[in-house]
């Protein structure tokens, strides 16, 4: 089966681009450049998607063929839940990106933004039988908040969507076993901070394990970390993402084009 989604472009004639879509495009393009800056890119693969406000269940996804460093607001593809491109573009949609992301956008009303990565330490933890350890600063914050989904290949079969959403439930941090990491949120900022925390937990876990025996945290300390972490607090999420966006603006603001 091809990794290119075989749907015909069905551009909506005279489809207006309102302010909400313009804002979403800039924000999502910024996220792609932030991922590139952090080294979370993977050639032309992996995806970040963002639902465009409105009743139509349309969302933006990266053009399959562009590196994250090349993505701009205007180059993003607008597609529906069937994977149809709603604006003219020479770029196709990646099938796996559509399957994984549309599953969450369709089933989880709060999943406005979905992010997926194949970082080295993220994939390493995804390959471990016991998964994410709670015995570090970041892992403790996520205790009880991480969902797991078993490996089913490259995620190109539509039938996987139901199993994926069932396994994820309402947990915003996800480990795709033997595959990679995934996070979602009410907006780009929440999804980003969730994924960043999960990524840091994986980084520390792999680094600590390579150095020797890990000093375990007590259940009480882990529970306290969960209570005090403020995971998902809107102001924190917004401030973090705004700071990262300023860094990207200072490096190369062309993503806004």
Protein language model regions, located:
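Glycine-rich flexible loops
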Residues: 1-257
